[in-house]
Amino acid sequence: MAHKGKAAPAKPPTSHKKEVKSLKRKRGQEELSTLRKAIDEFDLKSTPKAFAELPLSEPTAKGVRDSHFETLTDIQARAIPLALKGRDILGAAKTGSGKTLAFLVPLLEKLYREQWTQEAKLGALVLSPTRELAVQTFQVLRKIGRHHLFSAGLVIGGKSVREEAEALSRMNILIGTPGRILQHLDQTHGFDVDNLQLLVLDEADRIMDLGFQRDVDALVQHLPTTRQTLLFSATQSKKVSDLARLSLKDPEYVSVHAEATTATPSTLQQHYIVTPLPEKLDTLWGFIKANLKSKMVVFLSSGKQVRFVYESFRQMQPGIPLLHMHGRQKQLARLDVTKRFDSSKHACLFATDVIARGIDFTGVDWVVQVDAPEDTDDYIHRVGRTARYEREGKAVIFLDPSEEAGMLKRLERKKVPITKVTAKDSKKKSIRDELQSICWKSHDVKYLAQKAFISYARAVHRATERDEKHNENSDQVFKFDKLDLEGFAKSMGLAGAPQIKFQKGEDVKRMKNAPRAPLSSGSEDESGDDKPRRRKKDEVRTKADKMFERTNQDVLSKHYRNLVEDGENDEEEDFFTTKRVLRGDELDEAAGGAGAGLPTAKTIDLGGTELVLDSKRREKLIKSKKQLAKLKGKGQKLVFDDDGVAHPLYTLQDEDDFKQQGPAEALRKQFVEQEGDKVKEADIDDKALAKQKKREKKLKRKARERGEAEGNGGPQLAGGDDDDEDPLEMLRSLPMAGTTRDSGDDESEDERPKKKPKKWFQDDSDDERKPKSKVIELDHEPDTLEDYEAIAAGLLDD
């Protein structure tokens, strides 16, 4: 009878779970093989119009659809199919044409088809020229890749390097700026890029312009050569072509607007206003007051100008929210400004070219360029902040009368349509008195005005030198001498134009791109010494001490104090000015010989450069070869003819002298014949030398064979006797290759000894020569121990 009790607990359906996982894995493999087959069969000649027509995976297609991207732009329709097939791409398209999706979609598909996991580490790398563009690209990636399981990271400057380093080893996709990524490659342990599948360079021309060329070159050397590379830019330059040649393999050049009639979107209306430099700020104020219900971006040439215009206009309250952005701001402040301006309906953003590339702001109505850009590519990228994705937009640029002709000629060459407009008199208003009042009340704004004026003047001066060097007079935009700088300074509220010290363009550019030095924490003495005053550890500080040590907490106070000190020093130095520098002998003549008894400075001529030894430090300079080499000119290679006359090693012949020698074909034949004769003469000598070497080799071989046949351990030469002369004497008398023997060499004292000196353990007798080996003949094979002992005794016996 069966036992009746409680039923046993049911076992968990583990087999069912395993079966479900197996089916899911199998279904995924089938979908992956179907996707790969669809990509291979996709016709590149077709022109898809929507994302649904592309062979995309389900997570990517769903992410694109949820982000409300449906229609393909021209660059997306041509670049995405090529990238899906694994081709390297060099893409060029107008700004605002959707290049970001053109490389993000293939990036996700590449990792999805490779079944990339977190253990495989970094699989895709995206380089952006600016932090703002990197942040925007990362946000788009999060939207369209929300249904994937990849881990993505953002690496830009202004954030903690240690926090970034801790998360880098877990990233599959990385977006950042070249400098910070190269820093992690050199310093971060565990950051591995050996398995990288895809490299993307966004706005490559801007990456080159910002001085990242060395960083990118060093970065590419770290990456594997089997990667796929996508390079996108709105404009192409020589640096971009060089980068493409080094980093791309058989690239596909995709240029959707190469044959377009205009280089800018057709929905963009472009205008220019001719206004003198002293009236630019008045025109800008009137333009802002006339468009209070608009969203605009105002570009200026430097960060100091941005700060001055923002601070002064903010105090004048135009009636629209004002924001400003430049490269010297902290990263969190830049992100906050970007977010606030993007979410605003009506706002005015003063900015430098830091946001001129790739940044997509929502609903920008106007792009205003107060200062002319350095080239037309910068103009195209600036106006690209509006009229994006087939939307309408407007742009205006303020030009000085001296800049009008050159800028219009450049824009016409780049196929940029632009029309001239004039500002209404009713909209014009002079704000010179208001700015002067603000500068009088606020020393900080006055300091900003001075620095803004200096930075603008230096930028125009540098651009003028570059235009004069590379462009024709008709194509020159910037003309420093024709600008009314005195009137411009007064229009900014200053009493006059500040003094400017111009430097070389490369030095200014290097200083501008250099990182900021850390702020000094020490305080200077009242006496003006640079060394910080040390305070004792146990010294008691009273309230009075703290009050006297307190300084203005305003960020501009220290800079303004330095500016005031510099101005006071300039005024003191202006009392005595240097008119002429007299040498020692000229000073004696001027003094009528009164100083003849005093010591004068010595002068040394260093190949055309005179070195005055007027101090001990200058005298020590003579002992340093490295320092003297800097003062001397570069050497020239000279050759001397038969008469002893020196000539340069390399001389160029002009065209007339070359034609006098005869036709080129006859000279070529003559040269070929002369070289042929030289080859024949050299061939005769080579054959004779080879024949002699062959004969010597044959004689040596025969002598060695004869010596082995005689069994005396070495060859015996004819006529030689061991007791009379050295058997090697005849060999020493033979001529050696590359040496000559004279009759007097035998009697010279430097002649090498014929025989090697004997060691202490060798016999001094020359008459007795020991044989090298001794042979004992045996009648029978030894069998017993006595036989072996007898053989050993015979060998030991001399």
UniProtKB/Swiss-Prot annotation:
ATP binds at A93, K94, T95, G96, S97, G98, K99, T100. InterPro entries: DEAD/DEAH_box_helicase_dom, Helicase_ATP-bd, Helicase_C-like, P-loop_NTPase, RNA-helicase_DEAD-box_CS, RNA_helicase_DEAD_Q_motif, SPB4-like_CTE. Residues 16-30, 529-544, 666-689, 767-781 have a biased composition (Basic and acidic residues). A motif (Q motif) lies at residues 49-77. Gene3D superfamilies: P-loop containing nucleotide triphosphate hydrolases. It holds the Pfam family CTE_SPB4. GO terms for molecular function: ATP binding; ATP hydrolysis activity; identical protein binding; RNA binding; RNA helicase activity. Keywords: ATP-binding, Helicase, Hydrolase, Nucleotide-binding, Nucleus, Ribosome biogenesis, RNA-binding, rRNA processing. Its EC number is 3.6.4.13. It comes from the Eukaryota. A motif (DEAD box) lies at residues 202-205. Residues 1-30, 503-544, 653-781 are annotated as: Disordered. It is an enzyme of class 3 (hydrolase). It catalyses: ATP + H2O = ADP + phosphate + H(+). GO terms for biological process: rRNA processing. Residues 280-435 form the Helicase C-terminal domain. Residues 690-704 have a biased composition (Basic residues). It is found in: Nucleus, Nucleolus. One of its GO terms (cellular component) is nucleolus. Residues 80-254 form the Helicase ATP-binding domain. Belongs to the DEAD box helicase family. DDX10/DBP4 subfamily. Interacts with the U3 and U14 snoRNAs. Associates with pre-ribosomal complexes. The Q motif is unique to and characteristic of the DEAD box family of RNA helicases and controls ATP binding and hydrolysis. ATP-dependent RNA helicase required for ribosome biogenesis. Involved in the release of U14 snoRNA in pre-ribosomal complexes. Required for pre-rRNA cleavage at site A2. PANTHER family: RNA HELICASE. This is ATP-dependent RNA helicase DBP4. The gene is DBP4.
